[in-house]
């Protein structure tokens, strides 16, 4: 992770510093240091996405663009006119912050703004700022402790990333012909990072996603530091779970698109006399960049613009109304372009699709689950700040987002493609739409030094900041929550069973080297091979964004697998198949005389076609709770992704708690000479052993104790009968851990304990 941080800082810090200087000439080094990583990363996303959109992306051209961007940034921050009065507005403000006096007489506004910002900088609570920065650093904890992320979305992003590395565009991989329609910035920047550091595509996606979250957090600290609420920004973000949960679930583009909110908060939450034309340009640039990352970011920033316009046109000052009209023009241009693309390019393909609500109405229960405490405090903040311009903008921004969530209430509505597109785009908006607006509102109220703008010029702003008792209590809650979150992150780094691929799947990638022809892979998360050797074609691809598929072998190959259509595989030169212990195709191939294991690692298998039908077929038997009286039934987290069950395993698996001695009843078929047990280790128990009084050549064996799926094979003693396997443990007590699957509904246990889940037995003769 350190290498990733160094590369990202080295390439984005100077451009971000320059953009921070332009958008906020009053910023000092501390504020620029907070803003630069986020603004620089936003520019890198926009630049990389633009190159891919223009179909000219390459590693070399990307580096040329990075160098050019840094040269422009260097000139921006170093070149100044010797005559202060002839400098640009942001440069004159910068000079005013350093006590320089311009020759022009029109410096009243500049001096007033400089005075306000200098007061904010003097009143900073540096220890609290330091605490906020440390809290933000926890976003980098997971990629430091583990290699690959949890969730399933990252696998699709990794496949896209690898295609950009190899092909320079989002063409479909393997035996498929077509392309993906997906925002280009994230996969292209991940590809650049992967190529630069020689990283696995999945690792690059993982690290860039968490780096994006970190920069969003410190960027918001920098943006709200302009209002004297920098430290409170991170504390307010800590009251919600939304963006953190989305990052944990590997929804990285949605999180990265929040970088546009940093620009929005920095430029749109300020008095009219402090707004300049380059702020409008900055917002327009941010809209373009976030639209290339993920459309949700552009929608959210667009609604912030709308909120700003709604309150700007009601201000009494004519200058304010002119500014509001200019912003309205900008918003109209982007909205027109966005709707044109949606209606002409994307939406027609969704004409037959109904409005979709995968996770329910996002403005209801999901909002409360992921942002409940933050929402409660924000309601109080909205009341307290109702007479201020900044408070009204933030409140209206949240209200507009909430109204947007109503699209999920009309689930099933057809023939309105724009609504269908919105419902698919915003299917999980409770995790990423409301977190920042609510946190901004809370931070402005939380800070005791914030100076906000009265909505009515003739009136003085009458509002009181958050009571100190409440402020310190909430600070304690956030610190405690951060400690718990860090502890959970450390615990989960030892739970690879939560990954959407098994350890064997990853280990088996090396066996793919040198294979001629194409390889059949399952059309499921564990079947999408993002790191296949160059030239090797696999059959399955992830459904990400809109898939334009003109040719594919996946369906025909799957039918051929289940019907033993060997002619098909010979004609297509598809002589190998790759299966995961997480999937179901393995059971069909194992019992077919036309497929033979070529390489096996912990249940993951590379199969070779045997056209003569002379492969030795094992006997497979499922294990259920009736075979293990001391086990408890636990749901299979992947039960909804398994559509065939020839072993009658059902939706549950027998789970043996660490420290519990148990007997597993088995019945060996006649002629069996070897038994293989497939099991899933939950957590990292000290050690687990299996023994049998008869039936095994060696009566005592140690099983693997690392998290995830494993396969252990034992030679049988054919002169005796085996009826019972006894499992014992080195430790007498199981270790507790917080199981995130209990929150998502994929499991029923939240406060879980370590142990093993039995899957099935394979008898070889």
Predicted regions and their residues:
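Active-site lumenal/periplasmic loops and adjacent helix-entry segments of GT-C-fold
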Residues: 114-262, 494-499
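Membrane-interface transmembrane helices that cradle and orient dolichyl/undecaprenyl
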Residues: 261-280
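Signature aromatic-anchored transmembrane alpha helix within multi-pass, membrane-resident enzymes
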Residues: 328-336, 448-488
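Transmembrane catalytic cores of multi-pass membrane glycosyltransferases
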Residues: 1-3, 142, 149-154, 178-183, ...
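Membrane-interface alpha helices of multi-pass inner-membrane proteins
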Residues: 52, 279-295
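Hydrophobic/aromatic-rich transmembrane helices and adjacent perimembrane loops
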Residues: 155, 210-213, 299-300, 418-462
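Extracytoplasmic
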Residues: 459-460, 466, 476, 480-634
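Membrane-embedded, hydrophobic transmembrane alpha-helices
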Residues: 1-122, 339-346, 447-450
């Amino acid at each position: 992770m350190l290498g990733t941080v160094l590369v990202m800082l080295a390439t984005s810090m100077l451009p971000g510093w320059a953009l921070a200087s332009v958008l906020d000439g009053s910023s000092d080094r501390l504020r620029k240091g907070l803003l630069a990583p986020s603004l620089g990363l936003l520019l890198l996303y926009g630049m990389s996405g633009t190159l891919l959109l223009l179909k000219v992306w390459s590693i070399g051209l990307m580096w040329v663009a990075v160098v050019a961007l840094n040269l422009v940034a260097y000139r921006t921050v170093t070149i100044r006119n010797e005559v202060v009065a002839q400098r640009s507005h942001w440069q004159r403000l910068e000079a005013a912050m350093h006590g320089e006096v311009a020759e022009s007489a029109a410096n009243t506004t500049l001096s007033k703004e400089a005075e306000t910002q200098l007061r904010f900088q003097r009143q900073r609570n540096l220890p609290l700022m330091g605490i906020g920065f440390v809290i933000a650093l926890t976003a980098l904890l997971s990629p430091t402790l583990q290699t690959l992320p949890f969730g399933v979305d990252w696998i699709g992003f990794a496949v896209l990333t690898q295609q950009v590395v190899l092909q320079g565009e989002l063409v479909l991989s393997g035996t498929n012909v077509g392309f993906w329609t997906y925002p280009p910035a994230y996969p292209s920047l991940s590809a650049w990072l992967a190529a630069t550091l020689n990283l696995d595509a999945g690792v690059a996606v993982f690290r860039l996603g968490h780096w994006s979250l970190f920069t969003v957090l410190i960027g918001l600290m920098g943006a709200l530091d302009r209002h004297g609420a920098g430290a409170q920004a991170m504390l307010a973000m800590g009251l919600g779970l939304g963006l953190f949960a989305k990052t944990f679930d590997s929804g990285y583009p949605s999180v990265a698109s929040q970088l546009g909110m940093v620009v929005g908060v920095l430029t749109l939450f300020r008095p009219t006399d402090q707004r300049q034309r380059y702020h409008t340009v900055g917002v327009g640039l941010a809209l373009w960049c976030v639209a290339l990352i993920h459309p949700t970011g552009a929608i959210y920033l667009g609604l912030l613009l709308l909120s700003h316009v709604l309150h700007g046109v009601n201000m009494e000052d004519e200058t304010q109304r002119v500014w509001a009209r200019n912003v309205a023009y900008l918003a109209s241009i982007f909205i027109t372009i966005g709707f044109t693309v949606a209606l002409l390019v994307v939406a027609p393909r969704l004409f037959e699709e109904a409005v979709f609500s995968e996770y329910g109405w996002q403005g209801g229960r999901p909002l409360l689950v992921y942002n409940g405490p933050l929402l409660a405090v924000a309601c109080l903040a909205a009341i307290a700040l109702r007479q201020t311009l900044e408070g009204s903008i933030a409140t209206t921004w949240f209200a507009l987002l909430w109204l947007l969530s109503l699209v999920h209430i009309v689930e099933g509505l057809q023939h309105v493609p724009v609504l269908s597109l919105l419902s698919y785009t915003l299917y999980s908006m409770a995790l990423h739409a409301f977190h920042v607006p609510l946190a901004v509102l809370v931070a402005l109220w939380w800070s005791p030094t914030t100076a906000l703008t009265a909505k009515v010029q003739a009136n003085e702003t009458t509002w009181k900041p958050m009571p100190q008792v409440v402020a310190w209590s909430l600070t304690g809650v956030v610190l405690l929550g951060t400690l718990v979150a860090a502890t959970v992150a450390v615990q989960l780094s030892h739970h690879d069973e939560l990954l959407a691929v098994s350890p064997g799947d990853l280990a088996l990638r090396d066996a793919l080297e040198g294979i001629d022809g194409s390889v059949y892979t399952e059309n499921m998360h564990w079947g999408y091979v993002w790191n296949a050797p160059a030239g090797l074609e696999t059959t399955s691809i992830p459904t990400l964004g809109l898939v334009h598929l003109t040719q594919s072998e996946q369906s025909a190959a799957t039918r051929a697998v289940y019907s033993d259509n060997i002619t098909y595989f010979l004609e297509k030169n598809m002589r190998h198949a790759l299966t995961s212990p997480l999937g179901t195709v393995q059971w069909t191939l194992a019992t077919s005389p036309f497929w033979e294991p070529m390489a096996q690692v912990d249940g993951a298998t590379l199969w070779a076609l045997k056209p003569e039908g002379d492969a030795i077929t094992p006997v497979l038997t499922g294990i259920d709770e009736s075979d293990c009286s001391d086990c408890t039934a636990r749901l299979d987290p992947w039960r909804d992704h398994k559509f065939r069950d020839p072993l009658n395993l059902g939706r549950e698996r027998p789970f043996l708690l660490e420290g519990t001695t148990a007997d597993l009843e088995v019945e060996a078929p006649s002629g069996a000479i070897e038994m293989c047990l497939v099991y899933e280790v939950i957590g990292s128990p000290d050690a687990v052993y299996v023994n049998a009084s008869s039936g095994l050549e060696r009566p005592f064996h140690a099983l693997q104790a690392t998290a995830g799926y494993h396969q252990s094979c034992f030679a049988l003693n054919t002169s005796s009968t085996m009826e019972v396997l006894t499992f014992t443990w080195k430790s007498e007590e199981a270790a507790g851990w917080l199981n995130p699957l209990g929150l998502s509904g994929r499991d029923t246990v939240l406060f879980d304990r370590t142990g093993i889940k039995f899957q099935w037995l394979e008898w070889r003769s």
